[in-house]
Design a protein with these regions (language model features):
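Catalytic metal- and UDP-sugar-binding loop of GT-A-like glycosyltransferases, i.e.
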Residues: 103
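N-terminal glycine-rich phosphate-binding loop and ensuing alpha1 helix
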Residues: 2-49
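Hydrophobic helical membrane-anchoring modules
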Residues: 200-202, 206-227
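Short phosphate-binding loop-to-helix
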Residues: 47, 53-100, 109-113, 117
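Short beta-strand scaffold positions
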Residues: 48-50, 181, 211
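Short, high-confidence coil segments that cap the C-terminus of an alpha-helix
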Residues: 43, 95-97, 125-127
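Conserved core of the sugar-phosphate nucleotidyltransferase
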Residues: 82, 86, 108-197, 202-203
């Protein structure tokens, strides 16, 4: 059984310039992710999908295969699902593989066990496995939106009873960007993660940080040496 890891890193980033090449400690986010993938024994090959020559050059030092991504799949509003499909089609021209493993560059605090647990969990009759964490917010209890006449209202009103405590609300979780593992054909034949059988691995909050803002980057730099 062949397991291939894919790292997707665009050159453009609105909130943090050159985000994927920002350093946490002595290494860039890209380098950290590449080394995390290389430490997993049952990952047999690693690919980088990017539209950036600068990112590609940085990755080549680590002896991985580069997939140059078309510009139409690299815009701010481009769905990464289509980038996944593009990468799988590219690899399928040369190799056949059984598990697609995506390691987003923006989650440098992940551990080896998080990745290994996701790879194993796919064997339990799932099409794709995601990672989740406990959340402090709940759309039935303390998350609101602006409704008619700019009045605030609870996001989800589908339950026909008043929920006045967090414990009475349905249990919900945050999706994280720690790791995704899927059957390659599932990605090729569907349009989104939740089109089929979705499994999940719980990740503790301290390993689930997703770097999206300058504040997230500062927090990662504080936490990284301690993980």
């Amino acid at each position: 059984m062949k397991n291939f890891a894919f790292i997707f890193a665009r050159g453009g980033s609105k909130r943090i310039k050159n985000k994927n090449l920002q350093k946490i400690g002595q290494e860039s986010l890209l380098e950290i992710t590449l080394k995390q993938a290389q430490k997993i024994k049952n990952i047999h090959k690693i690919f980088l999908s990017t539209d950036s020559k600068k990112i590609a050059a940085a990755a080549k030092k680590h002896d991985i295969e580069i997939i140059m991504r078309p510009k139409n799949l690299s815009r701010d509003k481009s769905s990464e699902w289509f980038a996944w499909q593009h990468a799988i089609k590219h690899v399928n021209k040369k190799f056949k593989f059984d598990k697609f493993i995506c390691l987003p560059v923006t989650s440098p605090l992940r551990s080896k066990i998080d990745i290994e647990n996701c790879i194993k969990e796919l064997n339990n009759n799932y099409d794709i496995v995601i990672t989740i964490q406990e959340t402090n917010r709940n759309p039935w209890f303390n998350m609101v939106k602006i409704g008619n006449k700019k009045r605030m209202e609870i996001i989800n009103k589908s339950i026909n009873k008043t929920i006045d405590t967090r414990h009475r609300a349905p249990k919900v979780y945050d999706m994280t960007t720690v790791c995704y593992v899927a059957v390659p054909n599932y990605i090729l034949e569907n349009k989104s993660i939740f089109s089929g059988r979705v499994g999940a691995i719980m990740v503790p909050q301290q390993r689930a940080l997703d770097i999206d803002t300058p504040f997230d980057l500062k927090l990662a730099r504080l936490l990284y040496p301690k993980t």
